[in-house]
Amino acid sequence: TLADGIKLFFKEDLIPDRSDRFVFKLAPFLSFVPAFLSFAIIPLGGDFRDGNNGMVTWFGHTTRVQLADPPVGVLFALAISAIAVYGIMLAGWSSGSKYPLLGSVRASAQMVSYEAALGLSLGTVFLVTGTLSTSGIVAAQSSIGNWNVVATGVVPFVIFLIAATAELNRPPFDLVEAEQELVGGFNTEYSSIRFALFYLAEFMNTVTMSALIVTLFFGGPQPISFRGTVLDIPFVPNGIEGTIWLFAKVLVFLYIYVWLRATLPRFRYDQLMDLGWKVLIPASLGWFMLIAAQRLGRDQGWNTLVVSAVSVTVLGASYALLQAAFKVSAKQREAEGSMF
């Protein structure tokens, strides 16, 4: 892989005659730069034990082990990930070729569809932690029982993982660059360093999304702790130990992405859209309403079981009506299609 990367640097940078030259040159950077910008708000370490806020003191200076900690850090990450859509879309449009154009159309539809599920799945995280700051979210996950994957009931994590995989165009959702259908997808006409930038952006996005999953759902740089027992790394200061824990957790999700690539077949395009719009978005909305009702009932002193039962009943009825609407719409389309 390293040899292939070096080889690409010395290849000729070809630009198609029918392309929009300025946009064609700009598109790789619109994909490459956002892949690194999202890492700015991820805590890469720090001391979050015993209620600490992640600050560490190195060489007489007290600081966080992250580039920036805005109060809306998670929204920043979601906004930056949306910019990468433009890089892929413009790359296909500016190439002046049909296959890249089809790949970019697929990319825009797929990524916009799954961005909705991605953002909605985080609503329960904000509801449980009470903050949009990444350092605040990490600080709220002091033990395994407080990890958001447990506190939110696993479902938001599963939705986020599926939506993130689709957002990254990773298998089994890699319809943007399906070789059997689109030759190489949106980057078919690219070569040399610009081609390498797209692949570097894809791999870096996988690392960034894995780090974001760990930060939001698995305690980030927090060590593994259960019922007061902390799994320490001997002879390592707390500030550096957090970095080691973050790196180890990220490696687990990188392994999961490689495992998914090797085991699952590619989805059909209609299956991809149905999963996003008919399953993930309703599920994330329904789960958010359920968690919100439970927390409201707890604050008001209501019976949690009764509140949960009523919420599940209402959500189940709503989902049944939604499925009925889908079936009626499908029958109408079939009837209209049979007229021609």
Residue ranges and their predicted role:
Residues 1-340:
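Selective transmembrane helix interface/packing segments
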